[in-house]
């Protein structure tokens, strides 16, 4: 009887020990799960310097940001601002809420982000479409000159008068990425074409841009590209009145007047926001400067790199689109290297 009882006790103790070993193993697995959960619980916030409204630049960026958050398991939030003071307050709030990455965009954000990032060297920031040279900021730019090259090539192939124009905002380095890229693309397919260029003197002068576009139309230009930001509205008005063809910038403006606005040079802010958050999620995010071009889907041209809701204008036509697509492929492969006007001197 005693021997039997001893045997039962031994079996019981072995069972307890085995159960304890099992508990230790489960605890280790649970700890690994918690670690994975911690990785997935990263938080990122998009703080915009103005209200999204119907601004396609910010609408696209917000969409790409949220898409990446959902796909890569990052908690994301978008904060809109009503004015510069509110924007700086929102950046401070994002820091206080301990977001792992704080992203923003455009030159409007430069001053406030420079201040907040300097005050918080341990936080990670990213800014799109401008450059802030700080050790805790990732600046994301665009190779606008590659998109402009495609636009210039399309204009050079489509023009019937061999006179092509552009209304640009100002004669400054940033705008040269548009004007010189366009000029290079135009000359590559139509070296005999005449290129007219005028500057509106700012980014918001609708009346001046319209006036200059009419002057170019009277000189025989049948295609006049808009590169004057808000001033492009004046170019669009002139196109309706004078019957020439034009193009928009950043987002697909063809939907506003497909008869006259036949192309748009694109900045893919949705792709940028998505890729930057993806890099943050997988650990490849680095501070410093990075630039997105055709290869990275950062820039493009309607009908060539992205479809449009608008019908393709007969002025452009499928033959021109196909030729420009081939040029796009040559740029992506490196067969054609478009000159960066800011690095060419």
Where are the language model's segments positioned?
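Positively charged n-region of N-terminal signal peptides that target proteins for export
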Residues: 1-7
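Sec-dependent N-terminal signal peptides
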Residues: 7-13
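C-terminal motif of bacterial Sec signal peptides marking the signal peptidase cleavage site
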Residues: 16-20
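A residue-level marker of the well-folded mature domains of exported/periplasmic proteins
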Residues: 23-345
């Amino acid at each position: 009887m005693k021997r039997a009882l001893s045997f039962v006790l031994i079996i019981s103790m072995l069972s307890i020990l085995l159960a304890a070993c099992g508990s230790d193993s489960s605890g280790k697995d649970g700890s690994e799960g918690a670690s994975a959960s911690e990785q997935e619980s990263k938080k990122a916030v998009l703080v915009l310097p103005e209200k999204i409204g119907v601004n396609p630049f910010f609408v696209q960026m917000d969409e790409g940001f949220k898409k990446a958050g959902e796909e890569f398991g990052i908690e994301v939030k978008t904060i809109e601002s009503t004015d510069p003071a509110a924007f700086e307050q929102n950046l401070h709030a994002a820091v206080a809420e301990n977001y792992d990455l704080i992203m923003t965009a455009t030159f409007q954000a430069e001053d406030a982000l420079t201040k907040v990032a300097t005050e918080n060297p341990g936080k990670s920031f990213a800014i799109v479409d401008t450059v802030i040279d700080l050790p805790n900021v990732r600046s994301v730019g665009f190779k606008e000159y590659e998109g402009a090259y495609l636009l210039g090539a399309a204009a050079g192939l489509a023009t019937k008068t061999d006179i092509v124009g552009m209304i640009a905002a100002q004669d400054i380095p940033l705008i040269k990425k548009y004007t010189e890229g366009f000029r290079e693309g135009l000359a590559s397919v139509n070296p005999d074409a005449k290129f007219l260029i005028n500057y509106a003197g700012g980014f918001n002068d609708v009346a001046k841009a319209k006036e200059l576009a009419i002057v170019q139309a009277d000189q025989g230009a049948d295609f006049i590209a808009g590169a004057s930001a808000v001033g492009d509205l004046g170019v669009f008005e002139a196109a309706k009145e004078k019957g020439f063809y034009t193009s928009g910038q950043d987002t697909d403006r063809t939907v506003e007047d497909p008869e006259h606005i036949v192309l748009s040079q694109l900045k893919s802010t949705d792709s940028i926001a998505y890729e930057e958050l993806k890099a943050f999620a997988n650990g490849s995010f680095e501070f410093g400067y990075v630039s997105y071009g055709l290869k990275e889907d950062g820039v493009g041209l309607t009908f060539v790199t992205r479809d449009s809701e608008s019908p393709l204008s007969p002025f452009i036509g499928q033959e021109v689109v196909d030729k420009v697509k081939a040029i796009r492929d040559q740029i992506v492969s490196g067969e054609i290297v478009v000159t960066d006007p800011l690095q060419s001197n």
